[in-house]
From Swiss-Prot:
Superkingdom, taxonomy of origin: Bacteria
GO biological process: fatty acid biosynthetic process
Principal subcellular localization: cytoplasm
Protein name: Holo-[acyl-carrier-protein] synthase
Function: Transfers the 4'-phosphopantetheine moiety from coenzyme A to a Ser of acyl-carrier-protein.
One GO CC term, this protein: cytoplasm
Amino acid sequence: MIIGIGSDFSDARRIARSIERFGDRFLDRVFTPGERRKADQRKLRAETYAKRFAAKEACSKALGTGLSHGVFWRDMEVVNLPSGQPTLMLTGGAARRLAALVPDGYEPHIHLSLTDEGPLTAAYVIISAVPKTGV
């Protein structure tokens, strides 16, 4: 069953301006150390950050809270499965909100799609609940 859907667009030029203006203060507030390591290794650094920014916004919408009610930027981390597929790992307030949305006997699955065209990036998040195996 689908629990939540969220989408967001971001502009890498805007992210680049925020990095220029605020530097580490912006990066530390929004991105996890793992996300920073990955982005800082990429040639298209601002685009990498922009995709992750959009993913976090989309996830917060799918959670039904936006970036409020105890859900913070760094509670959501874009990670890759062994296959390379992106997904989100939630901690803190985002993880608590997700747990509150999932019915007993079910477990959450977060589906993330990222795309970009030039400086524009988009992210789509679908949070679903599937029956736990062995229950």
